[in-house]
Amino acid sequence: MGNRALIVMQTPSEKQPLVSAIYVHWNGGIESVEAICDICREREYRDPASDPSYAMARMVGVWHEFFGIANAISLGVTMYDGESDQGDNGVYVLGADWKVIRHFRHSAKAVAFEHECQTSEQKRWREEIKAFMQKQAEKILAKP
């Protein structure tokens, strides 16, 4: 049970068979992932293509900021081997300018599919999530 996903800043290779990944148990849908990416881009954080480790640290911070550490959001950092995923939403690969450049799920045959255009409903959800996150940020900044 959950809405799980893995988010990676780079894909495994022969030279580097394991890469760091962010695991989200809740809010792992494309709408939430892209909304978090939008926040990172707006804040002008270095992107995953130019500095993967920095980008990962910043993204974890944004997840905590908007969904709250105390709210048991089930967020973690793990290793990704290029073959496994956590089910539900699969794996998102981030690239330059905080864009989702690949999105895939592993089946028994590990078949990948490219992330395509969002539907209007996905765009609407993304905007609603982003608006919620902005309100959360305003509350945090308003605290004495």
Language model: regions and residue ranges:
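Short, surface-exposed coil-to-beta transition loops
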Residues: 1-5, 18, 86-88
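Short, flexible N-terminal segments of the mature chain
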Residues: 15-54
